[in-house]
Amino acid sequence: MARRTKGRNIDGIVLLDKPTGMSSNHALQRVKRIYNASKAGHTGALDPLATGMLPVCLGEATKFSQHLLDADKRYLVTAKLGQRTDTSDSDGEVVSERPLNFTQEALDAALDSFRGDTLQVPSMFSALKYQGQPLYKYAREGKEVPREARPITVFELNFIKLEGDELTLDIHCSKGTYIRTIIDDLGEKLGCGAHVIMLRRTAVAGYPYERMVTIEALEALLEQAEKEGVEPKTLLDPLLLPMDTAVANFPEVNIPDAVAPYLMNGNPVRVAGVSSDSLLRITLGEARRFVGVGAINDDGLLAPKRLVVFYDDEA
């Protein structure tokens, strides 16, 4: 059995509605403490300015968080036109101010240039690393270092409204897309400059928006549990989504109970009628209990890649 760690062995995913002004790591630690979880990890940082969906993986769900990092995201963003900042958002210093002299046709053309497959040069104020150090550390020292343009895809970019100097957009994009950079680049295309004043992540993969929960709501449940004299987990755990929702889009392969011990020890097993080049979601027996992900190896066997560790006293 795996080595015990401090905290509760609780597995699942909390769809946190991160508040503005809080780092993603701080939000993660708050959720971990509330659930008294032994392990926790988030699935893609949001800027402190940003709000919205931050899936927090607890326990064994952390093994599958990478697949949510790789998932598409959706954002609602409001930009202030006419001002450019050094961070491309309202947390930074204004570096230029220019009047708004563009037409609706020019705006439409500029927006269209971001749709589809493009290359994006990441902002210096990002967590990407150069020679082992995050770019934002160089930026804070007034240094600029080389950054390679990275391929991104904007599946949808919808114009919502333009009120005065504030432009609101809805953007559905691939992993690794920096919304701040899109807004900064848009401002330069329009000749007026722009920066983000509101950013909200409304979707990660296919997770339902209505299942998001705030830190305040979680803490209120803790207080309610104390008042009612019940275990906090009785009120908190129903908010968790199953850990296999992180890999819900993977093809399922179901294995019989008889071969489960062999597979769960890390050995490849033979399965009938499966010939996929992609990762597979492995379920066990008639109950279809999720046990991990695997892939078909060169010998045509199902080889486990990441397996769930189950505890006898798992809550």
Curated annotation (Swiss-Prot):
Q: Does the keyword tRNA processing apply?
A: yes
Query: What CDD domains does this protein's entry cite?
Result: PseudoU_synth_EcTruB (cd02573), PUA_TruB_bacterial (cd21152)
* Main enzyme class: isomerase
The alphabetized list of GO BP terms reads: mRNA pseudouridine synthesis; tRNA pseudouridine synthesis
Q: Which Pfam families match?
A: TruB-C_2, TruB_C_2, TruB_N
The gene name on file is truB
What reaction(s) does this enzyme catalyze? uridine(55) in tRNA = pseudouridine(55) in tRNA
Q: Does the keyword Signal apply?
A: no
Matching InterPro entries, A to Z? PsdUridine_synth_cat_dom_sf, PsdUridine_synth_N, PUA-like_sf, PUA_sf, tRNA_psdUridine_synth_TruB, tRNA_sdUridine_synth_fam1_C, TruB_C
Role description: Responsible for synthesis of pseudouridine from uracil-55 in the psi GC loop of transfer RNAs.
User: What is this enzyme's EC?
Assistant: 5.4.99.25
Q: Which organism is it from?
A: Shewanella amazonensis (strain ATCC BAA-1098 / SB2B)
The protein here is known as tRNA pseudouridine synthase B
Q: Where is the active site?
A: 47
The molecular function terms of the Gene Ontology recorded here are: RNA binding; tRNA pseudouridine(55) synthase activity
Which PANTHER family does UniProt cross-reference here? PSEUDOURIDYLATE SYNTHASE TRUB1, TRNA-PSEUDOURIDINE SYNTHASE
* Alphabetically ordered keywords of this record: Isomerase, tRNA processing
Q: Which family does it belong to?
A: Belongs to the pseudouridine synthase TruB family. Type 1 subfamily.
